[in-house]
């Protein structure tokens, strides 16, 4: 029995990145042998075991043969005769197919070290085309390693295009699509993930709502980049500078979906696009089983971002109504995230990247002032039920009116 460290742990060590998970491959062993050593078996499709002390994953060396459609359409063989080279060959990219022995020796049959040096994301063999999930994985790696200068090999991008046009992407489960997308949104360059999906023809299949934004113009005065799809990716890029929250970055991604529904004869104006986008956001979230936290923030941002952009002009009662509609009193953190999404929206425009966006701070300070209003004096005056709520709103409006007088722009 031989054990090798494989995959992402070896790759990240070589890239001098922090190693999160360590996965091992076990050569010439049986499930019974590992169970006797105290390992716990998990997974039904192929033999994976959890180390009793470290919790690391140990998988028996295996080969895979395509027998059906989609990411799970494989038949696995984990016999004693499967070699390390055969096990590494089934992996997606050369940089993920390097193994390390307990003595530190690197085993690199598919030239992953060379591709690390040249910053290339390259498939190992044409078997790459058998697994549609690899389109999303490569796009995610392109986003994750973009800052390091990694690029997708042209021939690998060609295979990704072939996969996109083959119909195989239709067999991916919603959960896997969202898992890869969520992980991509957590990288430093999530916009690259969506750009790669577009470059290989996968975006219209997986995210038709986002694909539909490309080619939709906005007024040049406010959007020098003009194209709404380009603007969307710029906003996603800006989102990274403001928050690492998944819900926040997703809301930035989908804030303008409604612009795709504007009749062409009304272009480049998009009046009411925020509310128009709500159904598209809900459809996308239903289809990919996206968490409610992401959906809720995304819908609020879509519906209210154009109003927030006019925050400096809003009367006190409009500001309090905005806070009421967004449940800011009970969910101040979400309200703050919503305002910051509008910062990303403003800065996600050509030439506006470094420009101030005072509206968010202005509204947030108004909210903090309104929050200080004490309900107890209202209750002591004898108001009850809905009257308390109405009087509290009036008191908050008065406090914001005073704030506006002191901070008039």
From Swiss-Prot:
A Gene Ontology molecular function term for this protein is: phosphatase activity
The note filed under miscellaneous reads: A single active site specifically recognizes both ATP and CTP and is responsible for their addition.
Residue span, HD domain = 228-329
Q: Which biological process terms from the Gene Ontology are attached to this UniProt entry?
A: RNA repair; tRNA 3'-terminal CCA addition
Family designation: Belongs to the tRNA nucleotidyltransferase/poly(A) polymerase family. Bacterial CCA-adding enzyme type 1 subfamily.
Q: Which cysteines are joined by disulfide bonds?
A: none
UniProt remark on domains: Comprises two domains: an N-terminal domain containing the nucleotidyltransferase activity and a C-terminal HD domain associated with both phosphodiesterase and phosphatase activities.
CDD domains the record matches: HDc, NT_ClassII-CCAase
Q: Which residues cross the membrane?
A: none
Keyword vocabulary terms for this entry: ATP-binding, Hydrolase, Magnesium, Metal-binding, Multifunctional enzyme, Nickel, Nucleotide-binding, Nucleotidyltransferase, RNA repair, RNA-binding, Transferase, tRNA processing
Organism of origin? Psychromonas ingrahamii (strain DSM 17664 / CCUG 51855 / 37)
Q: What is its EC number?
A: 2.7.7.72, 3.1.3.-, 3.1.4.-
Q: What's the protein name?
A: Multifunctional CCA protein
- Subunit and partners: Monomer. Can also form homodimers and oligomers.
Cofactor(s) the record lists:
Mg(2+); Ni(2+)
């Amino acid at each position: 029995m031989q054990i090798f460290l494989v995959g992402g742990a070896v790759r990240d060590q070589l890239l001098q990145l922090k190693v999160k998970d360590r996965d091992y491959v076990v050569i010439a062993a049986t499930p019974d042998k590992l169970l006797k050593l105290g390992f716990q078996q998990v997974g039904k499709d192929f033999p994976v075991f959890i180390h009793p002390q470290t919790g690391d994953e140990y998988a028996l060396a295996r080969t895979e043969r395509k027998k059906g459609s989609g990411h799970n359409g494989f038949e696995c063989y984990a016999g004693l005769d499967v070699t390390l080279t055969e096990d590494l060959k089934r992996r997606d990219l050369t940089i993920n197919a390097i193994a390390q022995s307990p003595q530190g020796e690197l085993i690199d049959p598919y030239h992953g070290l060379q591709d690390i040096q040249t910053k290339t994301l390259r498939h190992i063999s044409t078997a790459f085309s058998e697994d549609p999930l690899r389109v999303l994985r490569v796009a995610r790696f392109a986003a994750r390693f973009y800052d390091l200068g990694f690029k997708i090999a042209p021939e690998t991008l060609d295979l990704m295009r072939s996969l996109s046009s083959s119909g195989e992407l239709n067999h991916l489960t919603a959960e896997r699509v969202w898992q890869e997308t969520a992980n991509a949104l957590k990288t430093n360059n999530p916009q690259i993930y969506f750009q790669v999906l577009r470059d290989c023809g996968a975006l219209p299949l997986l995210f038709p709502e986002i694909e539909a934004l490309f080619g939709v113009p906005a007024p040049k005065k406010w959007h020098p980049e003009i194209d709404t799809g380009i603007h969307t990716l710029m906003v996603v890029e800006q989102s990274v500078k403001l928050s690492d929250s998944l819900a926040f970055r997703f809301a930035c991604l989908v804030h303008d979906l409604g612009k795709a529904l504007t009749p062409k004869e009304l272009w480049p104006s998009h009046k009411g696009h925020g509310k128009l986008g709500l159904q598209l956001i809900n459809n996308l979230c239903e289809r990919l089983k996206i968490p409610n936290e992401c959906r809720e923030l995304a819908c609020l941002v879509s519906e209210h971002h154009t109003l927030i952009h006019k925050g400096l002009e809003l009367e006190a009662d409009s500001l309090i109504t905005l806070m009421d509609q967004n449940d800011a009193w009970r969910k101040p953190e979400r309200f703050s995230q919503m305002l910051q999404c509008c910062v990303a929206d403003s800065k996600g425009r050509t030439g506006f990247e470094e420009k101030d966006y005072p509206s968010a701070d202005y509204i947030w300070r108004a909210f903090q002032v309104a929050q200080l209003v004490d309900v107890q004096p209202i209750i002591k005056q004898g108001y009850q039920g809905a009257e308390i709520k109405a009087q509290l709103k009036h008191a908050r409006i008065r406090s914001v009116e005073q704030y506006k007088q002191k901070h008039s722009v």
